[in-house]
Amino acid sequence: MMQCVVRAGVALALAAGQIAMAQEEDADIRSAIEAERQLLSEQTRRLEEQLAEYEAQQKRLDELESRLSDDRIPEVEKTRDEADSGVAPERLETGDNETRDSHEVMTAGDLAADDFVGSWPMFGSNYRMKIGGYVKLDALYDFDGTGDKTQFLIAQIPVDGSAAAQRDGYFNMFARETRFNFDVRQSSDGGPEKQLFLEMDFFDESSFSPRLRHAYAVYGNLLFGQTWTTIADLASLPFTIDFGAGDALFGTRTAQVRWQQDWNETWSWAVGLEDLQYVGIYNPNSLPGEATTKLPVLAGRVTKQTSKGRASLAALVQELRWDGQGLGPNASATGWALIYAGRRNFKGGDFWTWNIAYGDGTPETIMALTGSNANAVLEADGSLTTRKGYSVALGYGHRWSDRLMSNFAYAFTDLENLGLGQRAPDAIESGGVGHANLVWQQGKFSAGVELMWGQRDNADGRSGDATRIQAMLKYGF
């Protein structure tokens, strides 16, 4: 009897153990099932986000395709018709390849309104990214031995009687204008629009290393970093194959902080504090010290833009200073400039452009005079005398067909003559460059040929002229 009881107890214990093990296995299975459910739920959520992003992108593509419908009339033709239809003004749209640098700085509302075609979502965030740029091959023949073998610059035109004037013509082929950029933007989340933009090319004078062109951030209407100066209006420049683009132009890229805002659909304004890259003081008497500045450049611009064109009025004020460093004189002066620029569209796709600038103590901002100490003269008595200068750049674009167009441009600059000894004898005092080209374009691919002629006058009265022909193959992406 006792043995039976023991056996029954053992059996019950074994059964209880088996039940406990089964319960533990059941709990593990339930835990695994719950983990799989959570993983599946997370994957479903991500798929739904990607699907929503895909649908939004498809909607943007559909909107773009609808713009291009209308019996497949090219977009440039639509813009052309709207410009002459008398409809309410809209923002000016320019086709690819119409300006040498098509990148336009946008803030706030303009960023929100931009379609950002070609971008893709950065999954896990509300940012989108786009990679752009172009590959460009240039081949040129210079008839007069111009100093720069990659761009046609007034300062590099040989003058009569110089050793450079004895140089023969030459051929050159290069791809240094090739560039690439990264554009990152944040989709609207109820806050300010945001953008990061970085662009490089290979136009470094001493090597083929990448060279920084643009590096800036936008937060709403605030921009900070390096890009075109606030006073620059790229729409006022016709397309040229030559990278120099007729360097009697006012404005360059510089470090800055800028506020840029639309008043309405037609008017916008911008104001910025910028780095003064070249103080530009000529020291003919070799007085001790150096050119410097204690203040940033103050620049501003007002722009009117419609479907028929655009016009902008800009101004800048800057300080010029000579620091005697305890050994020479201390002196300061103020420089200023006014710039009127714009573009006017005509029926048939033609347009004309203008960029007119005049200033006192600011000629170094004219590209042809940059680095030539053209802003002011340090007199023997230690005072600063500012120098006046102006530049005029005019252009006309004519469209022969949807794929073929020509551009004609002339840019001229002149610097005030302050008298004998007030400028280095071999420095530029005036000069100009003309361009005429024929460009064929299909989609992102373009090819063209350009003839250019330039003339230079030095402070010592010597002058020279040069001629160059240049061809290109270019593919944008």
At which residue positions do the language-model features occur?
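N-terminal periplasmic/intermembrane-space "pro-region" immediately following the signal or transit peptide
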Residues: 22-148
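Outer membrane beta-barrel
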Residues: 117-279, 294-295, 299-307, 343-347, ...
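Sequence/structural signature of outer-membrane beta-barrel proteins
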Residues: 142, 187, 201-207, 231-233, ...
